[in-house]
Amino acid sequence: MLDNDISTASALHHLSVPEAAFATGADAHALDRRRFLQLVGIGLGAGLVAGPGSSLLDTAFGNGDTSRAAGPIGAGDGILIVLGMFGGNDGLNTVVPINDSEYYAQHGSLAIPAGQTLPINRNTGLHPELTVLKEFWDNDQLAIVEGIGYPDPDLSHFNSMAKWMAGQTTGIPTSGWLGRWLDGYLSGSKDLFAAAEVGHSLPLHMLGESSWATAIPASRPSFGARSEERYQRQYQMVRNLSASSTDFWNRQIGQAFVDQLEVASEIAPAIPEELPSVDLVARLEVQARLINANLGFRVPSAGWGDFDSHAGQPDQHPLRMQELNGAIRRFYEVLDPAWTTRVTFMTFSEFGRTSQSNDGAGTDHGTTAPHFVFGSNAQGGLYGERPTLAGLGRWGRMAHHVDFRDYYGSVIDGWLGGGSSEVLNRSIEDLGLFASAPGGTAPNGPIPDEPTGPPGVSVVAGSNGYRPAVRLSVES
């Protein structure tokens, strides 16, 4: 039995592959998936982890078909970048109610003075570090959805994270909402490049019933991507193992590594050896470069934290906002501008924080929080309803006004081509978050050597100087 108050890291640990439990295949000779990942972890740790929708593990688990697609994105296809803010983000200090006296009374010393925020109207300001999002707002390309949550909220990291990742509030989740979208999108075909988690494991929301995303580390693949003669000899030995071995185990593991070699050879040219030192910045740069390479990725995802600021929030939260801002800026510095009408970002977190600060200069697990959808095709504005803070005591929690599944469904239908009712097993209320469908022609030219950035978003790094203890660099 899991402790209801396990840490953010522990919750992610249990809700990600390879730590999640896997059902073994019907083939009596098939490897247990968890054991397989342990056996080949050294090789995969330097390259990729993929699921049953890919040739990499399908072959290893005796599931047959080794075909996979690595093709350019289709005409009119949108690319959705999903950012997980793990630990529970303080929504009140992200989208600040600058004219609400209750906010300043309840948040106390944690509250951000109105004059230090980035105002978007007379009642609301963005966190002072979110300068890039302010630029999107000024271009009518930032949708802020306030009051997102679900009925009877759970304050456990694990339980609430599982609900948000699964896209369901009841039952034991066996798949995630984006994974189920991937099931429908692929319709049984094999495509390793349709969705990717830039990280070292696959979180629940990227796992479908029949298809999974691919996990790509925020680094250049080394296994399978080295050109030196001695490495090429080693790679050939692996190929020979798969081709000639009569031993089932050697043949299956060897074939999995052959797939790994082939995948690395396609991805490695898009990723430089030197990446930014800040983790989220590096992850979003990898995403931008994979999009530039036009391999067919529809849903790149990444998560970071820790946002679980029970103490020391004045030092922690500004850094998280600074990381987010720097990562988005770096993404658009690297992205070929021809892709901007194809890309939309969205954020999620398992819950918000309490309106009342605690004695440790922090906040505790809350319920509702605002989230962002932004990009050149987003319909800028405020959506949903800001929860009232009136009458909330020390352990009072804000009421939600937008079901998180309506938030998800609005993105699925408005940006990914539809199918929300199948993915979420319910009808949704469309929030109308998009001004236009994905547009523009995918570029066919070479990947740009130098970052350029899209029109309307400055590529000059910087911050307005709001009190973080450490300055972050987005340089390589």
Can you name each region flagged by the protein language model?
Residues M1-D32:
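N-terminal secretory signal peptides
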Residues V82-G84, N93-T94, A143-E146, A195-E197, ...:
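Structural recognition of the beta-strand scaffold that forms the well-ordered cores
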Residues G445-E475:
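Pro/Thr/Ser/Gly-rich low-complexity, intrinsically disordered linker/stalk tracts
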Residues G76-I79, N89-E135, N139-A143, L155-M165:
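Active-site-surrounding "flap" and adjacent substrate/cofactor-binding loops of secreted or lumenal enzymes
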Residues A70, N123-E229:
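Extracytoplasmic mature domains of secreted/periplasmic and thylakoid-lumen proteins
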